[in-house]
Amino acid sequence: LTAAISVLSAMGVQACPLPTAVLSAQTGYEDYHCVSLTEEMEQFRRSWEKMEARFDGIYTGFAADEEQIGHMIHIAETFHKKKAFLLVDPIMGDHGYKFDIFSIEFCRKMRELAKMADIVTPNLTELCILTDTDYRMIENMTDEKHLLTVIRQLAENLRKDGPRTVVVTGIQFCDNEDGIQKMGNLAVTGKRHILQHSRM
């Protein structure tokens, strides 16, 4: 959240944050402390609604549990209908594994939120979770074109459920032309797809 606000502010966007939790470290560490702010989320929504707040965009990120996703959905239903753009970063896992703190029910609720989004930005693991795909089917693919074709099809499958655009982040592959390991993001919008990448 702190990193995102800095970037948004530098772009001239006034952010109105709603923290979902305070963590001593990110969830990739074995030991961290998490203070959930679930009980505060509805109070934020009610306060903004009473103020007749209008947002140009809503950007969701880390949620500590499925109850928080329920609050995110309620907030999106309140303000998204007022033409606010909805971007969902469905934080659930990485490198083929779901983060241990998240349940199957959590992932189901995240699918529900993702369906409401204008843009959803999963990494490859999260894309597999959202589309109920076995990550192992993809992880050993070495052919760049085949890998990107499969990822694009999964993104299209997700788009059929609701989001207009799917941006799959952190895709690692070996470039067929120069043999160099690269990492990139694949944006899929309708019949268009754009891959941006750089050397690892």
Please state what every model-predicted region is.
Residues 11-14, 26, 43, 68, ...:
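Residue-identity detector for glutamine
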Residues 24, 95, 174-175, 194:
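Flexible, glycine-rich phosphate/dinucleotide-binding loops
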Residues 1-100:
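Conserved N-terminal subdomain of the carbohydrate kinase-like
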Residues 101-193:
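Conserved phosphate/ATP/ADP-binding segment of small-molecule kinases
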Residues 193-200:
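Short pre-catalytic strand/loop immediately N-terminal to key active-site residues, enriched for Gly-Thr
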